[in-house]
Swiss-Prot record:
SMART domains: PHD (SM00249), TUDOR (SM00333)
Protein name listed in UniProt: PHD finger protein 20
Gene name of the encoded protein: Phf20
Comp. bias (Polar residues): 267-280
Impact when changing residue 103 to A: Abolishes Methyllysine-binding
Sequence ranges of Basic residues compositional bias: 542-554
Organism name: Mus musculus (Mouse)
CDD domains, alphabetized: MBT_PHF20L1-like (cd20104), Tudor_PHF20 (cd20453)
Amino acid sequence: MTKHPPNRRGISFEVGAQLEARDRLKNWYPAHIEDIDYEEGRVLIHFKRWNHRYDEWFCWDSPYLRPLEKIQLRKEGLHDEDGSSEFQINQQVLACWSDCRFYPARVTAVNKDGTYTVKFYDGVVQTVKHIHVKAFSKDQNIVGNARPKETDHKSLSSSPEKREKFKEQRKVTVNVKKDKVEKALKTEKRPKQPDKEGKLICSEKGKVSEKSLPKNEKEDKENISENEREYSGDAQVEKKPEKDLVKNPQENLKEPKRKRGRPPSITPTAVDSNSQTLQPITLELRRRKISKRSDTPLKRPRLDKNSPQEQSKKRSENSDKDLSRRRSSRLSTNGTREILDPDSIVPDLVHTVDTNPLPDKSPSAKDSAEGQLKSPLEAGQVSSALTCHPIGDGLGAADLELNCKSMGENTMKTEPVSPLAEVQEVSTVEVPNTLKKVDDSVTLNVPAVDLDHKFRCKVLDCLKFFRKAKLLHYHMKYFHGMEKSPEPEEGPGKTHVQTRGSAVPDKTSQESLTRKRVSASSPTAKEKEKTKEKKFKELVRVKPKKKKKKKKKTKPECPCSEDISDTSQEPSPPKTFAVTRCGSSHKPGVHMSPQLHGSDNGNHKGKLKTCEEDNLSESSSESFLWSDEEYGQDVDVTTNPDEELEGDDRYDFEVVRCICEVQEENDFMIQCEECQCWQHGVCMGLLEENVPEKYTCYVCQDPPGQRPGFKYWYDKEWLSRGHMHGLAFLDQNYSHQNARKIVATHQLLGDVQRVIQVLHGLQLKMSILQSREHPDLQLWCQPWKQHSGEGRAHPRHIHITDARSEESPSYRTLNGAVEKPSPLPRSVEESYITSEHCYQKPRAYYPAVEQRLVVETRGSALDAAVSPLCENGDDSLSPRLGWPIDQDRSRGDIDPKPSSPKVREYISKNVLPEETPARKLLDRGGEGLVSSQHQWQFNLLTHVESLQDEVTHRMDSIEKELDVLESWLDYTGELEPPEPLARLPQLKHCIKQLLTDLGKVQQIALCCST
């Protein structure tokens, strides 16, 4: 039965309705209705900012649901105080962005929950709360009415007289700003120009307002209102009469002895008496800046709260702390950039170029000098050039950071100049020259900061604007496919050298700027540094086949960029640090446990170690100078001449795949010889003392998803070498003594398997011969021998012929036996059986003719016979997989497998009447050819006959070789006499004893495991 929700004041029972709900911990949270169950009379409540797993069903008349009236009433009251009413669609407003700054936007929708959907002027659409939307025309009133939450006790005074005076100043400033906004809207056609005017005051005050914030708030995100609130502190600090500063802009620039470079347009004491004069001056400054199209400087870092005397003392005593603090507070190139207003550029220049270096400078001026000494100097940032603060110190810091990051020579050529000396040197610079150099340096800035606080893309025909430099960097990298151009690295550096040629040598700065470097404060740069080190560590590893499982691997001792910078700050030779780096990062290629090497590898180890250390010490000193593209190439820096032949065993990338599923490399590592993956020795129960001679990991021993027979594929060396597993405590291993016989037997088995495959191919060819209408018969329109090296007409046969011709020289390798046999005929002494077996028996054991047959079997006859067999057995697959007989049954009905004589009888009976006329016709020189089908059958029949002869010859050779092997075993006494039952009791006793011993071993293993 459907129920109707109750009528509760302030709560509308519909999906998405806002309310407050109390959870089971008796805490009230803002929530909304997720779902309504009309049959049960309940609602599903979702608590805001909590996961959906905390959603809870409430009865809709539950007392634990209440409306949001109180919060809404309180917020409405705040709106009334701020003087902002509800905004309409298409109304121009100031909306708060994620950096807590307000930007011009237009309302596109008014939502039910009290939020607004606004569209910023760069096209970004966002939903913001109503407390983050302000009226566009009343921007400065909102800022002015906001009371400061926390101010510095040195900057603000609580006396009522000063408060009254500041209120008057603020009112006048607001009127001036309104006039500016109106004129700017008329004269300039830029959409965000009013916002620039709205923030005219805050831009200059940012550097002093930052002084009043505590140190733990190290965020470059401040509201406009916060900057305005700190304005009062700035006004109290400089309480000196500055009415004489209100002059022409040209006079302002030429006046050298200004105590404090405060812009005349925002001097609080001058506003009262000269408000009419301020307006044209400000507009003139703005027009000049717009015509120059100069990019706005970046925001300065915060100043310390210490007194000027303490700061100068601290500066002289703790220069190292200054450097580290500068590094930590520095903004990365792709980080968030906050932008000063363009009108504050000229006042900053006037404020900085102070030609009075005497100690009676005002405290505020000293504070600003201290703040400028800590200004960011990064590649791509030209704030130092724009504000023209002491450039020598900035360049010195940059060189120090470059030298910390690069591994090259001249590590500490450039020493940071003392700050006081820099202030004195910069005081001699003339103001017009400074402005000229500022304009030069502005053109080199890559993140183009537009006057309306946008970063503009420099690519032609691209009209994209971005609010942050990081977004512009992403756009350039992923949209245009361009990394950072060389302009931000070299441009500012060259400008600095031209401006302050006396501070730093030109050559050193050029060298340091051309080096590849990474910012110490950028987190992305740290990650790039670590990935580059990891790539370099992987590139210089060498894996000798005999020693690759016996390496000790340790973690790099100094992988971090901080450690590198700390180490390289000391003026030590770079080669020493390179050797330290080699000893840490590349220990896998150098340190090997001496217990794990055989006698033949002992002297080999010393060569490897010295050679690798020498090579690494030279190569790793240049490792940080490599670019990203050079890292992708294989660089052979540690090639041992003894191991150049084993090129297949060099692996540039190593994988740690252990049962513990931890990807770290620590302590003793062991490598699988099959998949080249590394495992922790502790996890596998192996120590340096008990490493097996051949190690295979748990995955290769039992590969998942494979057939059961593949489980033993890793242990295939006994097929080619004849060494089978035996008991370690036995002095004489049976397989080691009889390795040659095992290998020879396996080769015979491989040859027999080949013959079986060729016979199966013969069956298919016989089925083709049975019917004249078989579609594959036309493939034999030409004789086989003319096309044996050129392939066939049918693409399938061409493919298989090529595969056979490639497989034929190395067919035994596929069976796991030996390497490719020599194509040349071998002599009697070089044949396999003669060289390895027959030397133990009399040479006259076989007649000379039989010996020659045996030699043919393993010599040229083997390859000459097997190659056509492989080519003719065109339907056989890889010998590793065996022969799938059912695969090609679609070719025709296959008779039972015929032996050689039966095949010949069958051919002579069935095909002889067709063969004879064809032969006669050919003998007569082609007089009156028979039909084409008869010719095709004749070609195929000729091929089958030749193949049959080769198979017969091959079987005879295998039989003779088998006789040689068996007779040699009889001669050496390895095989028992013809009565094997005579040893049966002894054999039973040995088997029982072996079973007893295995039972004891199993009990011991159980006891040890428990």
